[in-house]
Amino acid sequence: MKINIIYWSGTGNTEAMANYIKEGANAAGADVTVKNVAEAVAADIECDVLCLGCPSMGAEVLEENEFEPFIESIEGIVKGKNLALFGSYGWGDGEWMRDWTQRMETAGAVIVAESLIVNETPVGAECIDFGKSLVK
């Protein structure tokens, strides 16, 4: 099973989540690639599960300079793709993740796991378990 994890991180929390998720998915037998969104291309959606991570920014939105343009570039081609979402936040109640999940479902993606959100610093075990859950 091939899992691609693409993320953007400002403080390092979402990057840490990506690496823990990789650890869990690897432990469950998946072949996992982790990329910062700055290195990602639309072809990276060609995998068994695409796992996207972005923290909440500003008024609970996705990061606008790198991550949002990537999401816009794949929004028209994610129909039928298995997708999982994760991210960290410093305040608020997770509205950005609910909005993002709805947006991807509207685009036709198949959400394969309940989105993982953490306040500030991630707990490794929680992220590792999320990674394991992606391997079916």
Language model features with spans:
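FMN-binding flavodoxin-like domain, especially the glycine-rich phosphate-binding loop
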Residues: N13-A16, Y20-K35, I45-K136
